Curated annotation (Swiss-Prot):
SUPFAM superfamilies linked: Translation initiation factor IF3, C-terminal domain, Translation initiation factor IF3, N-terminal domain
GO molecular function: ribosome binding; translation initiation factor activity
Protein task: IF-3 binds to the 30S ribosomal subunit and shifts the equilibrium between 70S ribosomes and their 50S and 30S subunits in favor of the free subunits, thus enhancing the availability of 30S subunits on which protein synthesis initiation begins.
Keywords annotated in UniProt: Cytoplasm, Initiation factor, Protein biosynthesis
Protein name: Translation initiation factor IF-3
Annotated TM spans: none
UniProt-listed GO biological process terms: ribosome disassembly
Predominant cellular place of this UniProt entry's protein: cytoplasm
InterPro entries named among the record's database cross-references: T_IF-3_C_sf (IPR036788), T_IF-3_N_sf (IPR036787), Translation_initiation_fac3_CS (IPR019813), Translation_initiation_fac_3 (IPR001288), Translation_initiation_fac_3_C (IPR019815), Translation_initiation_fac_3_N (IPR019814)
Subunit structure, interactors included: Monomer.
One GO cellular component term noted in the UniProt record for this chain: cytosol
Gene: infC
A Pfam family recorded for this sequence: IF3_N
Gene source species: Bacteroides thetaiotaomicron (strain ATCC 29148 / DSM 2079 / JCM 5827 / CCUG 10774 / NCTC 10582 / VPI-5482 / E50)
Disulfide bonds: none
Amino acid sequence: MKNDTLKGQYRINEQIRAKEVRIVGDEIEPKVYPIFQALKMAEEKELDLVEISPNAQPPVCRIIDYSKFLYQLKKRQKEQKAKQVKVNVKEIRFGPQTDDHDYNFKLKHARGFLEDGDKVKAYVFFKGRSILFKEQGEVLLLRFANDLEDFAKVDQMPVLEGKRMTIQLSPKKRKCLKNRRLPNR
């Protein structure tokens, strides 16, 4: 299916409508040729005349094996896609009354996520009347951000969204982060 979209992208051989074309390539002197001469040259070499740049005046063409050209394009696109950095957002949930042991456990996991290059979204979930303790939730999230300041920078300060108060952290550039230790509280 993707190959079909690449096929329709370039005009080849008789599909080229211009009267003259500029041919570029390895074994051909780059200059302007009439279309019939360019097609004849491609036919003699048992290759295709492919219109690379249709908007140029005159259009730029190459004499190449079209299927090989499509294969190389597809391969290049696949390599570019593999080089893209995929950012994951990991969520960590707290309650407004989170105990120190639970806090340290979640802090340790957040540190691991940040070292792996993932973003961390920490939130305090308020159930029922616990929304009255939103100041405690904000203090907890600010403490969380402060404890991770060596590993992360704050993208978004604590914000109350419905029954959740969230903070978003993204990893700092890596420079010997693995040797640092978490503060004990």
